[in-house]
Regions:
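C-terminal interaction appendages of subunits in large macromolecular complexes
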Residues: 1-230
């Protein structure tokens, strides 16, 4: 039946666990890893994992929070990874961690703006994705070719995976992918599963979500309506 976390950690009234992370057993490797924090209000912070190496039984303050804000997710990442933030109203934003978020040296900070939210919206999840240097035209070409190959093999997922990413500059110029480049992109492809509060799901290729600078409104990840809910 397990053991109640309240018996392991001195949680205060109303305090909840937001993330549980699996760490390498060899703590000498921790210096190459970082922790990324995301809050409900759209802030994000990046710290070296070693900043949290020595934690006593009473815990440590992990992040400074404004009134009403809370941490929604914590993840292990490297500087060359992308972070994907998604909101309750179906927006998402993706950016390169090492370029867009400076490495904080302490824990007494609320971080920087990751995504700009509309009134009433909030961040509900964060995911870490492989960063792949691919032009808009290459990504469109890969998605089209991947969908064609799935249809040729009778893979029903071809109808839900492989849609073109939101139109952006250079995406309509076309690209000819060599077999080697197609294989390279395929090896780095990941999939994002977005599920609404009413149980509707959308499976999206990581190449459908373009990278941008942090702090913007992002793009539509999933349509929010009466059928789907948030």
């Amino acid at each position: 039946t397990g053991k109640a976390l309240v018996n392991l950690l001195p949680l205060e009234a109303g305090e909840v666990i937001t993330s549980i992370l699996l760490l390498p057993e060899d703590n000498e490797t921790w210096a190459s890893l970082e922790l990324v924090f995301a809050t409900r209000s759209g802030n994000i912070r990046r710290n070296s994992l070693t900043d949290f190496e020595n934690i006593n039984r009473n815990g440590k303050i992990a992040m400074k929070l404004d009134e009403g804000d809370r941490i929604v997710s914590v993840a292990i990442a490297r500087p060359d990874d992308d972070v994907l933030l998604t909101t309750a109203q179906g927006q998402c934003i993706r950016f390169l961690i090492g370029e867009e978020v400076r490495l904080f040296k302490g824990r007494d900070s609320d971080g920087v703006r990751g995504i700009r939210l509309e009134d009433g919206d909030e961040v509900i999840s964060m995911a870490i994705l492989n960063h792949v240097d691919a032009s808009p035209a290459e990504r469109v070409a890969y998605l089209k070719q991947a969908a064609q190959m799935r249809r040729a093999t009778g893979d029903e997922e071809a109808e839900t995976v492989g849609a073109e990413p939101e139109q952006e500059e250079g995406a309509d110029e076309g690209a000819d992918l060599t077999p080697e480049r197609y294989a390279e992109l395929g090896a780095r492809e990941q999939f994002v599963l977005t599920v609404s509060e009413r149980g509707f799901g959308k499976r999206t290729s990581s190449y459908e979500v373009r990278t941008s600078g942090r702090g913007g409104k992002g793009i539509v990840s999933m349509v929010v309506n009466d059928r789907n809910g948030n």
